[in-house]
UniProtKB/Swiss-Prot annotation:
Residues 1-32 form the signal peptide. Residues 130-232, 454-553, 557-662, 671-778 form the Thioredoxin domain. The gene is DNAJC10. This is DnaJ homolog subfamily C member 10. Endoplasmic reticulum disulfide reductase involved both in the correct folding of proteins and degradation of misfolded proteins. Required for efficient folding of proteins in the endoplasmic reticulum by catalyzing the removal of non-native disulfide bonds formed during the folding of proteins, such as LDLR. Also involved in endoplasmic reticulum-associated degradation (ERAD) by reducing incorrect disulfide bonds in misfolded glycoproteins recognized by EDEM1. Transmembrane segments: none annotated.
Length: 793
């Protein structure tokens, strides 16, 4: 017999069932939401190269093409592919680190390549230690470091790129130490390749700071590549003889530079001319390279006790004719790389600064200083000995300090492990610690950027909590790749905003208490302190966008609305006023992503559309009254009419500044004139006004996107130049006569009063501000011509 439940019991039991279901469902979700780093088997500190290598290994193992009998293969591969797509992208990685997968709702991915792609096309040079795969954020710093770079721009799907790969690897091994060999994957870094003018693959370019890039056009053999590279290597080999020997040696020794000399005699082997040239390039600025023909310089060779062919390194101050009692290094190898490594290993270490003189030395010069504890770990990398030479022209001295000799000094600088830092000539007050790669080109780029920027390392003693001047503080962790990528941009921004804002960085792995005090929950978190006001930066990691953010703080482009001001400014707006309003909530991630784009859009619409935002967390009742049901809700309030209160809601997929701007401008009344063949002839070709014309076709997508921009241009030049539009679908003959071959085409028709006729110029940009600037420049030229003609009369 069944048991009847009363209504209250039924509702109570139903709630329990639903609660149990939700608990089980959430447990399943948590169980399946695997950490992206764990999926790929990498740490949170993994570099882009390590992430690519880990993904490739898994892709070859788990790809559905290799597991046709596994029904879960597709789903399993999608998970690791998703993890890779997110972690390889700097912006997505930052979102994931900060918000988890919820922060990636607008970036769902879901596509992957065939197994053959991952086996043969993916990460072509990731396993080659002599070849450095460069990414956009590090490219400029690398090629401007002062070293010579030869870079291969390739595409994974390009057959010629794969044909070149074995030769490029052999070439890289051949010239290792002579110059840097790089590679750029244009499939991953399309923007970088476009910026560098790369439009075919493979494209090979030589880069050196201070000179224009040089493209290689020869055949792709190793010998031809070596020959081309050697043309750009700075190498001078001196033939030594009785007439120049003493002066050459003494001059070099006085400058602290030694000599590598190969003596060529009848017996034994001396270095070939090609090997000597390569060594000269590899040791440029560190050691002079020379050779001596003992057949013609017999007495000189005998005085040096040289009786057979040999090669020797003479350090500064060596006694040349007494090889038993000094540090002359005789070399048995004939291989350039082996000789290079042995010579550079024997070069003296950097100057060791003492605790007593440290403050004074740092106060009078700019220094790159290595901190070590007892043994100098940097001596294991002989390449770093090039730093002194490569930083000489930047007036940066290079030294080291042993923290075990004065622990208090390092503790006060918050140096607790081997590190390097730049000191900017003001003692220990102004310095910046390096958090990048411990390799030559990265250290060079850091040193040059840091001494010329205004970023300082912060600690409790100099944290600007109550400073009267505004500060931008970057809270970061050294293990976080997006944090490291942001640091060079902060240095650039500090130069752009010098005198307006101070810049500092705070390492949250060292100063955990300070970071907790300011509730720092993700890295990097960038905050502007302006006395009692604190503003968190949410934009992209670029100097330009940081500059925009600061400018917006000083001169806000978006009106922060309250229910009262919304009623006064928006609801009761003047007849000819229009508004765009963002209804948002601070906890909403898409709202946070939108905010910098919203501000950027507002700056471009100044004087045309009023832009505001209202916090629906603070004014929840008001937003409910306005029927705001989701965040962010973007509304356009058109000019007031006799109609009831109305607005347009934005339903577009893209919430970037450009898309929102185009959408808003589309509601404004047309200012330009629609022209027919008759009016085009009468007003433009036979009239006496300047005209800018948009030739378009209604079916053309780019034309539709450009239409609001052209209306913005029409408003900007109103009163100076008239703006018109010609429909080339309706009036094909008119457009044909005007020489129109693509849509949209913009032409400027300017009336020359002196000649009483029209001239025309095609404009090759679709940016309203740029077009307006070009037109203003042309009008100024016409005015100056008119003045000169009057003066001549």
């Amino acid at each position: 017999m069944g048991v009847w439940l009363n209504k209250d019991d039924y509702i109570r039991d139903l709630k329990r069932i639903i609660l149990c279901f939700l608990i089980v469902y959430m447990a399943i979700l948590v169980g399946t939401d695997q950490d992206f780093y764990s999926l790929l088997g990498v740490s949170k500190t993994a570099s882009s190269r390590e992430i690519r290598q880990a993904f490739k290994k898994l892709a070859l193992k788990l790809h559905p093409d290799k597991n046709p009998n596994n029904p879960n293969a597709h789903g399993d591969f999608l998970k690791i592919n998703r993890a890779y797509e997110v972690l390889k992208d700097e912006d997505l990685r930052k979102k994931y680190d900060k918000y988890g997968e919820k922060g990636l709702e607008d970036n769902q991915g879901g596509q992957y390549e065939s197994w053959n792609y991952y086996r043969y096309d993916f990460g072509i040079y990731d396993d080659d230690p002599e070849i450095i795969t460069l990414e956009r954020r590090e490219f400029d710093a690398a090629v401007n470091s002062g070293e010579l770079w030869f870079v291969n721009f390739y595409s994974p799907g390009c057959s010629h790129c794969h044909d070149l790969a074995p030769t490029w690897r052999d070439f890289a091994k051949e010239v290792d130490g002579l110059l840097r060999i790089g590679a750029v994957n244009c499939g991953d870094d399309r923007m970088l390749c476009r910026m560098k003018g790369v439009n075919s693959y493979p494209s090979l370019f030589i880069f050196r700071s201070g000179m224009a890039p040089v493209k290689y056009h020869g055949d792709r053999s190793k010998e031809s590549l070596v020959s081309f590279a050697m043309q750009h290597v700075r190498s001078t080999v001196t033939e030594l003889w009785t007439g120049n020997f003493v002066n050459s040696i003494q001059t070099a020794f006085a400058a602290g530079i030694g000599w590598l000399i190969t003596f060529c005699s009848k017996g034994g082997d001396c270095l070939t001319s090609q090997t000597r040239l390569r060594l000269s390039g590899m040791l440029d600025g560190l050691v002079n390279v020379g050779w001596m023909d003992c057949a013609t310089q017999d007495n000189l060779c005998k005085s040096l006790d040289i009786t057979t062919s040999t090669t020797a390194y003479f350090p500064p101050g060596a006694t040349l004719n007494n090889k038993e009692k000094n540090s002359i290094l005789f070399l048995n190898s004939l291989d350039a790389k082996e000789i290079y490594l042995e010579v550079i290993h024997n070069l003296p270490d950097f100057e060791l600064l003492s605790a007593n003189t440290l403050e004074d030395r740092l106060a009078h010069h700019r220094w790159l200083l290595f901190f070590h504890f007892g043994k100098n770990e940097n001596s294991n990398d002989p390449e770093l000995k090039k730093l002194k030479t490569l930083l000489k022209n930047d007036h940066i001295q290079v030294g080291r300090f042993d923290c075990s000799s004065a622990p208090d000094i390092c503790s006060n600088l918050y140096v607790f492990q081997p590190s390097l830092a730049v000191f900017k000539g003001q003692g220990t007050k102004e310095y910046e610690i390096h958090h990048g790669k411990k390799i030559l080109y990265d250290i060079l780029a850091f040193a040059k950027e840091s001494v010329n920027s205004h970023v300082t390392t912060l600690g409790p003693q100099n944290f600007p909590a109550n400073d009267k001047e505004p500060w931008l503080v970057d809270f970061f962790a050294p293990w976080c790749p997006p944090c490291r990528a942001l640091l060079p941009e902060l240095r650039r921004a500090s130069n752009l905003l010098y005198g307006q804002l101070k810049f500092g960085t705070l390492d949250c792995t060292v100063h955990e208490g300070l970071c907790n005090m300011y509730n720092i929950q993700a890295y990097p978190t960038t905050v502007v302190f302006n006395q009692s006001n604190i503003h968190e930066y949410e934009g992209h990691h670029s100097a330009e966008q940081i500059l925009e953010f600061i400018e917006d703080l000083m001169n806000p482009s978006v009106v922060s609305l309250t229910p009262t001001t919304f009623n006064e400014l928006v609801t009761q707006r003047k007849h000819n006023e229009v508004w765009m309003v963002d209804f948002y909530s601070p906890w909403c991630h898409p709202c946070q992503v939108l905010m910098p784009e919203w501000k950027r859009m507002a700056r471009t619409l100044t004087g045309l559309i009023n832009v505001g935002s209202i916090d629906c967390q603070q004014y929840h009742s008001f937003c409910a009254q306005e029927n705001v049901q989701r965040y962010p809700e973007i509304r356009f309030f058109p000019p007031k009419s006799n109609k009831a209160y109305h607005y347009h809601s934005y339903n577009g997929w893209n919430r970037d500044a450009y898309s929102l701007r185009i959408w808003g401008l589309g509601f404004l009344p047309q200012v330009s004139t629609d022209l027919t063949p008759q009016t085009f002839s009468e007003k433009v070709l036979q009239g006496k006004n300047h005209w800018v014309i948009d030739f378009y076709a209604p079916w053309c997508g780019p034309c539709q996107n450009f239409a609001p921009e052209f209306e913005l241009l029409a408003r900007m030049i109103k009163g100076k130049v008239k703006a018109g539009k010609v429909d080339c679908q309706a009036y094909a003959q008119t457009c044909q006569k005007a020489g129109i071959r693509a849509y949209p085409t913009v032409k400027f028709y300017f009336y020359e009063r002196a000649k009483r006729n029209f001239q025309e110029e095609q404009i090759n940009t679709r940016d309203a501000k740029a077009i307006a600037a070009l037109i203003s420049e042309k009008l100024e030229t016409l005015r100056n011509q008119g003045k000169r003609n009057k003066d001549e009369l």
